[in-house]
C-alpha cells in the first residue's frame, strides 16, 4: 500500500491553493469542469461559502474574505467577495444546504482521469 502522505503526490499548500481557486471560479461562473476527486473536495467549501453569504454579517464577510481569492468578475466593478454576498447568496435564502450538484462525465482522453462538472443548483 502506498504511503498515505504521498498518496496524491502533492503537499497541502498546493491542495489549498487549488481548492480556493476552484471554489472562487465555481461561485463566479456557476459551474466548473474538473476531475471527480477535486469536485468532491471543493463541494463542502463551496457550500460553506454560500452559507456565510446567506448570514451576511461583518464576521461572515471577513471569514469569506480570508478564504476566497479576490479576482474581478466580468463587469469589473465587483470582486468575488461582493459577488458572493450580492448575487449568489440571495438566490439560496430559502434553501437549507445542497447548493451544488456533481455530474459525472466520460473519462479524460489523455490520462483516463474521471471527470465531473460541479455546478450551483
From Swiss-Prot:
Family: Belongs to the bacterial ribosomal protein bL17 family.
Molecular functions per Gene Ontology: structural constituent of ribosome
Keyword ATP-binding: no
One Gene Ontology biological process: translation
Name of the featured protein: Large ribosomal subunit protein bL17
NCBIfam families: L17
SUPFAM superfamilies hit by this protein: Prokaryotic ribosomal protein L17
GO cellular component terms attached to this protein's record: cytosolic large ribosomal subunit
Top-level taxon of the source organism: Bacteria
InterPro entries the UniProt entry points to: Ribosomal_bL17, Ribosomal_bL17_sf
Keyword tags: Ribonucleoprotein, Ribosomal protein
Record's subunit section: Part of the 50S ribosomal subunit. Contacts protein L32.
Amino acid at each position: 500500500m502506498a504511503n498515505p502522505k504521498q498518496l496524491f503526490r502533492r503537499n497541502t499548500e498546493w491542495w489549498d491553493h487549488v481548492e480556493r481557486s476552484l471554489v472562487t471560479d465555481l461561485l463566479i461562473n456557476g459551474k466548473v469542469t474538473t476531475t471527480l476527486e477535486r469536485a468532491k473536495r471543493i463541494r463542502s467549501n463551496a457550500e460553506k461559502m454560500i452559507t456565510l453569504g446567506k448570514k451576511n454579517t461583518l464576521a461572515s464577510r471577513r471569514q469569506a474574505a480570508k478564504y476566497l481569492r479576490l479576482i474581478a468578475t466580468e463587469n469589473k466593478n465587483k470582486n468575488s467577495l461582493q459577488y458572493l454576498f450580492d448575487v449568489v447568496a440571495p438566490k439560496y435564502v430559502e434553501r437549507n444546504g445542497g447548493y451544488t450538484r456533481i455530474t459525472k462525465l466520460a473519462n479524460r482522453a489523455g490520462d483516463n482521469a474521471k471527470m465531473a462538472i460541479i455546478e450551483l443548483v
